[in-house]
Amino acid sequence: MGIISALVGGIMDATRIAKTNKALNELTYEEVVVQNKYAIKMPSFLSPKSNLNEDASLQYASRILDIAFLVIDEPKSEFIAAIEESKEYIPGLGDSLLDNLAAVTIHNMFDDKDIETGNYRQTTINGLNAITLNVFQERTFLKDALYASFAFIEGKDTVYQIIIMSGGTSIKNFADKLEVTIQSFREL
């Protein structure tokens, strides 16, 4: 059994490396318009999905590359009301809409357990106020860590969360390509 597992693992690793190289060498972007709310340029190495997150208005992923890309949008007024209800349960919430969105999202996804955050940056994306940051979580039950990159964007009447997750290290190979996608986001 051990030899077969090693062979299958080696074949899977070789397949992943070949797919990664192909994705990097044949990269193109396609603009996707979602519900006439926003547009974003998606990389060719990700494919549309519909079963990753029921709240997401845009879902793309690559199983072989172990990358998921989601956009969740919600009315700003609903989020502000939810923040007021959450202030007693989530420490550190303040007056900044985007900081609160980041805190609530990370709290809900990771439960604040054993995470490292980094690369926090206040910025603008096509004229909209935004925050970007990365999260890393070691997972003892699997050999890989969980990597996530976020962009929290304040639109006119809507807040947007761009969530990119990977259970493997392939996200490092695609970080600059995914950054192009984040920076292409525009509200319509």
Question: What is each of the regions a protein language model found here?
Answer:
Residues 1-77, 107, 111-116, 121-128, ...:
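N-terminal targeting sequences that direct proteins away from the cytosol to non-cytosolic compartments
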Residues 61-99:
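A short acidic-to-branched-hydrophobic micro-motif
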Residues 96-109:
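Acidic, glycine-rich loop-and-strand cores that form catalytic or ligand-binding grooves
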Residues 97, 153-154:
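Short beta-strand/loop turn elements enriched in aromatics
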Residues 134-138:
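Generic short beta-strand segments
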